[in-house]
């Protein structure tokens, strides 16, 4: 069971610049120890990227009237599809450094329930 589940609802992978940024960020997550990655949504190219990078893909995220994924739905899907002790919602353009997991472990030692914001 991974310690942390990272979950995100990326933008479509249609713009080459955005696609490169998101691919680099998501790849950085997959290189971390003790981490599971879940990508949420039906955006163009998302299923293919998830398969290529070997991460979970859950297309059925609820959205508001403007088509924006609902945070509540994202958390619900992550909780239902993960056995991790920690959940981390993250923007798909954020590269994580190798010390991320160790820092999360240290925070978990300080408090049973916590929220970290960057």
Stretches with model-predicted labels:
Residues 35-42, 115-117:
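Short, hydrophobic beta-strand segments that form beta-sheet elements in well-ordered domains
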Residues 39-87, 97-98:
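Active-site-proximal specificity loops/subdomain of glycosyltransferases
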Residues 12-15, 93-97:
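Short acidic, S/G/P-rich loop/turn micro-motifs used as interaction or catalytic elements
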Residues 96-118:
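Conserved donor-nucleotide/metal-binding helix-loop-beta segment in metal-dependent transferases, i.e.
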Residues 1-28:
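N-proximal low-complexity "stem/linker" segments adjacent to membrane-targeting elements
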Residues 90:
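Catalytic metal- and UDP-sugar-binding loop of GT-A-like glycosyltransferases, i.e.
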Residues 19-26, 73, 99-103:
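Well-ordered, non-membrane alpha-helical segments in soluble/globular domains
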Residues 3-4, 27-38, 55:
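Short loop->beta transition adjacent to catalytic acidic/histidine clusters or analogous donor-positioning motifs
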